[in-house]
């Protein structure tokens, strides 16, 4: 590609990522990995990711909640300069986990999501301070 993929970027998405201090990626497991479209999106926004916090949630209809997807994705995220938090959320048996309004029906999952979000916010704040105040 002559323009190093610049023509494939979505300007609105790039601007949103640039303004964000952290990202949440929710993706299904696809052939023991993450979907190709997610890889495409990640590869077309390289500079916007450096020193940003990211949390990952896996989704599956089965009992593992996208564990293999997360395991495949984390090294890619680190290579892009994103900082992964240590909490992941595995939405296993996703078809039974949410009610008709999209609310989580299992209180244990609600607690996991709360821990996940708290850790993501903490890491995003720390990294924002670093981006704004420390030399790279």
What do these predicted ranges mean?
Residues 1-8, 97-101:
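N-terminal beta-loop-helix "entrance" segment that forms/cooperates
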Residues 2-5, 61, 105-108:
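Pocket-edge positions in alpha/beta enzyme catalytic cores
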Residues 5-81:
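Helix-loop-strand module that forms the ligand-binding subsite of alpha/beta enzymes
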Residues 83-136:
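Glycine-rich phosphate/pyrophosphate-binding loop and the adjoining helix
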């Amino acid at each position: 590609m002559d323009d190093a993929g610049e023509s494939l970027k979505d300007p609105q998405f790039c601007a949103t990522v640039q303004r964000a201090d952290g990202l949440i990626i929710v993706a299904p497991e696809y052939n023991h990995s993450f979907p190709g479209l997610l890889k495409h999106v990640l590869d077309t926004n390289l500079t916007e990711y450096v020193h940003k916090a990211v949390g990952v949630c896996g989704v599956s209809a089965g009992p593992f909640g996208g564990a293999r997807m997360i395991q495949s994705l984390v090294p890619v995220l680190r290579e892009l300069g994103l900082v992964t938090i240590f909490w992941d959320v595995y939405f296993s048996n996703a078809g039974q986990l949410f009610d008709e309004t999209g609310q989580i029906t299992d209180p244990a999952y609600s607690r996991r999501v709360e821990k996940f979000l708290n850790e993501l916010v903490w890491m995003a704040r720390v990294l924002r301070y670093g981006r704004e105040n420390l030399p790279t």
